[in-house]
Design a protein with these regions (language model features):
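Beta-strand/loop substructures that line and gate deep hydrophobic ligand-binding cavities in soluble
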Residues: 83-136
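Hydrophobic ligand-binding cavity/cleft-lining segments
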Residues: 1-43, 48
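Beta-strand elements of well-folded, non-transmembrane domains
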Residues: 10-12, 59-61, 72, 87, ...
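Glycine-rich portal/gate segments that line the openings of hydrophobic small-molecule binding cavities
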Residues: 39-85, 104-106, 139-154
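A generic structural signal for secondary-structure junctions
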Residues: 22, 32, 123-126, 150
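Short, surface-exposed coil-to-beta transition loops
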Residues: 3-5, 63-68, 89-94
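Short loop segments at secondary-structure junctions
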Residues: 12-14, 74-75, 100-102
Length: 154
């Protein structure tokens, strides 16, 4: 099991940051285009417990879909999604939101995953390659969200 953690402070109200981060449509807008191609809500209310979203990504030249289910949500505090179908043996994403000083919001995003031993992604990515790609993606996504929310271009 590999764990990747990213923290960022965004100069915006917690409600705005939570709303942007937890909208499935924004995943494709914030993650690097070479990793995430599409993202959309596929069942239930957007980002409510039990709802599912589909993220289409590209892993070392191979396109694949990941179905994620929202398994825990606390408004303006936390969103947990887990892969129910997709290229990873296991994938869980935990986004935590905390009120900071002077209208800042602290976001802690932790992804735990396990690569499969077979299949598309298992054949094309080594552990360190996958970790580097995911680390770059989570960092770039956080910076993109920060820029959008701080410039109010949402």
């Amino acid at each position: 099991m590999t764990t990747i953690r990213n923290e960022i402070e965004i100069n915006a109200p917690i409600a705005s940051v939570f709303e942007y981060y937890t909208n499935p449509d924004n995943i494709k807008e914030s993650w690097p285009r070479e990793i995430v191609k599409e993202s959309e809500n596929v069942s239930g209310q957007k980002s409510e417990e039990g709802s599912e979203m589909k993220v289409t990504g590209e892993y070392m030249g191979k396109r694949d879909d990941m179905l994620l289910e929202v398994v825990d949500k606390e408004q303006n505090k936390k969103l947990v999604t887990r892969q129910t179908q997709g290229p990873f043996k296991r994938w869980e994403s935990v986004q935590e939101f905390q009120n900071g000083q002077k209208n800042y919001t602290r976001v802690v995003h932790t992804i735990e995953y396990e690569l499969p031993t077979t299949g598309k992604i298992g054949n094309f990515l080594t552990g360190s390659q996958a970790e580097e790609k995911i680390k770059q993606g989570i960092q770039q996504a956080a910076q993109t969200v920060k820029q959008k929310l701080e410039s109010k271009s949402v």
